[in-house]
Regions:
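Secretory pathway targeting signatures of secreted, lumenal, and periplasmic proteins
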Residues: 1-21
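Sequence-level motif detector for i,i+2 pairs with an aromatic at +2
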Residues: 2, 13, 48-53, 78
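Serine/threonine-rich, low-complexity intrinsically disordered segments
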Residues: 11-13, 46, 56, 109
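Short linear sequence elements within intrinsically disordered, low-complexity coil regions
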Residues: 12-18, 31-35, 79, 92, ...
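Stable alpha-helical elements in mature extracytoplasmic
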Residues: 14, 18-26, 96-103
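Signature of long, low-cysteine stretches enriched in small and polar/charged residues
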Residues: 25-74
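Short, well-structured beta-strand
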Residues: 53-110
């Protein structure tokens, strides 16, 4: 399936606050007759520079399509940089470490 990645910066957020916020957002947003969150898992991986990156994996169904969303959250002092990766498909085994290397280590985070 297609993979779509986008980056954002959130100021004055901690990684844990942002992940909690995202969990709530997904739970509320994908909660009607057409869509639902099936499963959410989170944890941490290490970026190349040793920074602890928090990840959130969301398995959801929307209009009979299974989708997998992965959020990587990289803290930079007072802010966090996020990379949101969307698969228009169900991904059974998400390798967060590999995604971190592909998407986070590839960009220059100041």
């Amino acid at each position: 399936g297609d993979v779509y990645a986008s980056y954002s910066t959130y100021t004055h957020y901690s990684a844990s606050d942002l992940v909690k916020n995202m969990k709530d957002t997904y739970t509320e947003y994908y909660n009607d007759e057409n869509s639902k969150v099936n499963e959410m898992t989170d944890g941490t991986v290490k970026a190349k520079d040793g920074t602890e990156v928090t990840y959130l994996v969301i398995q959801l169904t929307s209009y009979d399509m299974d989708r997998t969303e992965v959020l990587l959250v990289y803290p930079t002092g007072e802010d966090v940089v996020t990379c949101s990766i969307s698969y228009w498909d169900k991904v059974d085994k998400v390798d967060a470490q590999k995604l971190c290397e592909t998407f986070m280590d590839a960009i220059e985070i100041k």
